[in-house]
Amino acid sequence: MFTITSYFGFLLAALTITSAIFIGLNKIRLI
C-alpha cells in the first residue's frame, strides 16, 4: 500500500510540474 501511495504521489507531482511548465510556455508564447 505504501508503494501505491508513493507512486500516486510521484505521478501527481509529475502532472503538476508538467502543467506548470505547459502554462508557462503558453504565457511566453502569448507575450
From Swiss-Prot:
GO cellular component, one term: chloroplast thylakoid membrane
Recorded superkingdom: Eukaryota
Subunit and interaction comment: The 4 large subunits of the cytochrome b6-f complex are cytochrome b6, subunit IV (17 kDa polypeptide, PetD), cytochrome f and the Rieske protein, while the 4 small subunits are PetG, PetL, PetM and PetN. The complex functions as a dimer.
Pfam families: PetL
Recorded family membership: Belongs to the PetL family.
The keyword Plastid belongs to this UniProt entry's keyword annotation: yes
Location in or out of the cell: Plastid, Chloroplast thylakoid membrane
Record's keyword terms, sorted: Chloroplast, Electron transport, Membrane, Photosynthesis, Plastid, Thylakoid, Transmembrane, Transmembrane helix, Transport
Keyword Iron-sulfur: no
SUPFAM superfamilies listed in its UniProt record: PetL subunit of the cytochrome b6f complex (SSF103436)
UniProt-listed GO biological process terms: photosynthesis
Residue intervals passing through the bilayer: 4-24
The protein, known as: Cytochrome b6-f complex subunit 6
